[in-house]
């Protein structure tokens, strides 16, 4: 695989999360998606931010394909903040995406060279991407090539730090960090 550097100012999609703990607003995180590098992964994430694809239907069960109302269920300081479980909201969901239950890995070409790198959390192993993702809270070069890294926090690193402060070494959070609203800016 090839690791490509971040190029500020590129015309890439930008999505956002407005985050809160209880009734306390934490602020907004904006994420620039590298759709030129990982188009399928970025389209899945973008659609899950906008909610434009409706519901995932399996039998009588309907799961909204939207991050609004989802949680950051696992936060480990100096490492990562994980969220996006649309089924169970605690990391144990089977996984859903705009393509069905899961989709294959794309070239993991963004480097985990700073805080704010956004990647898929393929909890079931390789080629098992769904809705769960994580945001790096520091450099993590050992993850290069192991997770599909497709975006970077372009605004709101202070909000990311506020989430990090609610984490623990085991990943449990103090308070429930919720995506109050999300969508696409550009």
Give the location of each predicted region.
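Cyclophilin-like peptidyl-prolyl cis-trans isomerases
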Residues: 1-186
